[in-house]
Amino acid sequence: NQGGHCAKGAALREHGHGEKRLKYPMKLEGGKWKRLSWEQAIEEVGSKALQIREESGPDSVYFMGSAKFSNEQAYLYRKFAAMWGTNNVDHSARICHSTTVAGVANTWGYGAQTNSFNDIRNSKCMMFIGSNPCEAHPVAMQHILIGKERGAKIIVVDPRFTRTAAKSDEYVHIRPGTDIPFIYGLLWHIFENGWQDESFISQRVYGMERIQEEVKKYTPEEVEHVVGVPKAQMYRVAKMMAETKPGT
């Protein structure tokens, strides 16, 4: 963190004392939010929960924890589920992070990030897809900006023009949900121009032939139709990634 506080930690007080924090229960009635007393909210939620348990059994309820829980909150939440009578209690990481670990392990052979912050600082080209470290990971952003000061090119691919995009050399505005067609569109240009790293592929990659066959469907015209990014920009980004090394 280069000796500085992480913005997330510095802003932690806002979780409990921020002006925008919800301070009382609200209920949606007739399309409008109505304020409730704590007593009424507890009564309504409790009565409905007990009705569900009586009619469908305790295992009909699924308790989903949060990464924002403190240790004490997580402990109490698990105890509450046990008191309720079910083992159906899980954590959001099971949905978001476990799938990442499996995917990354299958792709890179290691179930975690494959490069360090020092690699980012020394990178000459960085691409961010659906990633906004300026707000989501401020400590990482410090290292990214050091890399930029050293001459690294930054490419940000996102439906929104984020704060990270404001620091980019190339902002690519894609339609939501078109990340994979975008990647295949880049690969189309890379294969078309022979920019792929054959040495790396032969030593560390299997199944590339199947990828090449699939990529043939993602012509510049098809990608522009699906993703919304013109051929010239797709070519420019692919060329930048292929020729500016090392990259991440």
Language-model features: locations:
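Active-site phosphate/pyrophosphate-binding segments
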Residues: L186, R204-T248
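Active-site-adjacent structural elements in folded domains
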Residues: W108-T114, I201-R210
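Membrane-interacting alpha-helical segments
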Residues: W188-M208
